[in-house]
């Protein structure tokens, strides 16, 4: 369970704060799903064991905490009116930050996603 999510973003001149905030929140939610839950599982012959959403674990709204978002006060000479692209940049730092938090908690840094509770338990036991 993720208890708190705080994200800093450099979007240059933020022309539409609500839209930019939504972009960051969506990217963080997607990244939490990728870091903790989502995994394509294969059988021994290479067949997909998780072909439908009933068997493929994705985060629910209850799995995603509110995200505090702080925008850096910068400007970009190349962007329109000083804006920078946000696209999916919020996605990139989430898994490494979570891996560092897990290392701080149990002394071992996971190097594989998803960082499921089973994998974390094995890491903590020295099994992984």
PLM features: what roles do these ranges have?
Residues 1-128:
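C-terminal catalytic domains of large/alpha subunits in multi-subunit enzymes
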């Amino acid at each position: 369970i993720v208890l708190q999510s705080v994200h800093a973003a450099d979007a240059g001149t933020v022309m539409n704060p609500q839209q930019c905030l939504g972009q960051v929140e969506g990217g963080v939610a997607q990244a939490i799903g990728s870091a903790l839950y989502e995994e394509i599982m294969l059988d021994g012959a290479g067949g997909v064991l998780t072909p439908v959403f009933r068997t493929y674990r994705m985060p629910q709204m209850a799995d995603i905490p509110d995200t505090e978002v702080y925008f850096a006060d910068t400007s970009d000479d190349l962007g329109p009116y000083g804006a920078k692209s946000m696209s999916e940049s919020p996605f990139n730092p989430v898994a490494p930050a979570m891996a560092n938090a897990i290392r701080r908690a149990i002394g071992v840094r996971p190097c594989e996603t998803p960082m499921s509770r089973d994998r974390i338990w094995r890491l903590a036991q020295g099994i992984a």
